[in-house]
Amino acid sequence: MSFRKPKNRKEICYPFIYESALTCDYEVHTDELCSLLGMVLAQMPEGFDDVVADLETLHPKIYHLNGSVRGKNGIFEEDLEWLHERYDHYNKLSAGRVTRFVLPRGPVAVMALHQCRTGSKKTVRLLHRLDESGVKFEETLPRFANLLANFFFVLTVYIKMKLDVEEIDYISINY
């Protein structure tokens, strides 16, 4: 089969979907990440107004991250500073709760946050591949994506702590 771009615009889900460059893969992936974050917001239990407010602030920044490779940069030092502050806030509140590698388990919102966490790691990998292929972008992007993965993890720990959900250690047989 010869895979061709349709002439009918209704049959094209994204203007760049037929590109062979990784840029489109990055954009489709970060679009998925933004959707996953929307799912987290839809599933957040009562009593987490602080987390909801932070996730609502963060939500459009995922689309800023999305458009920052093809378009102009939308992730700035101020965004990194804000995310560092929020990471430190939740990390301090849940200090000492996780000291080992834990299995990703918990209520739906926590599991959706774990999906965001792993999606952020994929974002870092795609940025790395884009960089290797010669695509230029601001160094704030991989820093933000790495921090994002860690932030999502800290939120899972904080939420499970407040809900009194046990963390289950993962005991590796590999290392």
Label every model-predicted segment.
Residues 1-175:
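Phosphate/pyrophosphate-binding loop motifs in nucleotide- or prenyl diphosphate-using proteins
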